[in-house]
Amino acid sequence: KLSGAAATLVANGDVEAALGVDMNGATRRTAALAGVDFLKPTYGTVSRYGVISCAASGEQVGVYAKDAEKVAEIMGVIAGHDDKDGTSLKDEAYDYAITDVKGKKVAINKYLLDKADDATKAKVLAFADSLRANGVEVVEVSCDMAEIANTAWQILMCAETCNNISRYDGVKFGHRAKEYKNIDELYVNTRTEGFNFLTKAVILYGSDVLSKTRYKDCFDKSLRVRRVVAEGLQKAFENFDAILTPACSKSEYEAYDIKDAFGKVFEESVFTAVPNLIGIPALVTNGVQLMGNHFSEATLLSLANSVEKEGK
């Protein structure tokens, strides 16, 4: 069954909070399955210094906790400018204060809702009902932009990861193969031993989309899709304070062979790719996901808190 160590530790009460790097939504999926909160903040608000970089243009350090109040508390400590991180925004601090949500407007993405199983749909609809009870206007919309966003992000993520982890060659740092006869064998044996099947698949696909024959049709086009998606979401956030979606398609997953992982991850990432692609914040709470405009973390946390208070 799919689980995450950090999410499990928080769920079990072993720690009050934990940090995780959200690159492709895995942190949000494991939080949803474990029943804890996870906030992927606006890109550049939390330092990535010290993180092993894979997909640098979309990965972001976020916070696991049992409730929105604790997430807000931790974010108030870790967010802010860091000279050691070239992607860090210049703001020294951000506002994560939880406020009243009466009058806020939230959209449910019915397109993504229909892709989830019945148990997950029930969680989303129950969350929406709780928001309405707290004075939030909730309406249904249908938008398939998540599909092209997912495809674009998988291309960009694989390309960036391929480039970034090329440094792991057994020479300067990381794993080093013990048996080799020349430098080429050192590279091959080190990477064969050190990378699992999924990582190797990402490297191969990333290398392909960066090739001379595929760069323009794949990588370059994905960058253009990123801009189109960003513009489309900006228009949506002119009318809504947040978008409510499932965080994943199921409430529980059975184990599957690692060789099927690449396809499985692609299928699930349709729910989580948009925030990574365009850098907006996303909060998983009560097994559902809230997405907001850049720097709208306080709104997302407030919406989550209004529902969480009912369950206490």
Give residue spans per PLM region.
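Flexible, glycine/charged-enriched surface loops at secondary-structure junctions
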Residues: 84-89, 135-144, 234
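Glycine-rich, small-residue loops and helix-cap segments
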Residues: 16, 78, 125, 130, ...
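Short glycine/serine-rich loop segments
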Residues: 1-78, 278-286
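Short connector loops at secondary-structure junctions
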Residues: 133-153, 286
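A short helix-breaking turn/cap at a secondary-structure junction
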Residues: 40-122, 127, 185, 189, ...
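Short acidic, glycine/serine/threonine-rich loops at helix termini
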Residues: 28-33, 50-51, 119-121, 150-153, ...
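Flexible loop/turn segments at secondary-structure boundaries
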Residues: 25-28, 115-117, 148-149, 211-212, ...
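Acidic, glycine-rich active-site loops and adjacent beta-strand->loop/helix elements
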Residues: 23-27, 33, 112, 144, ...
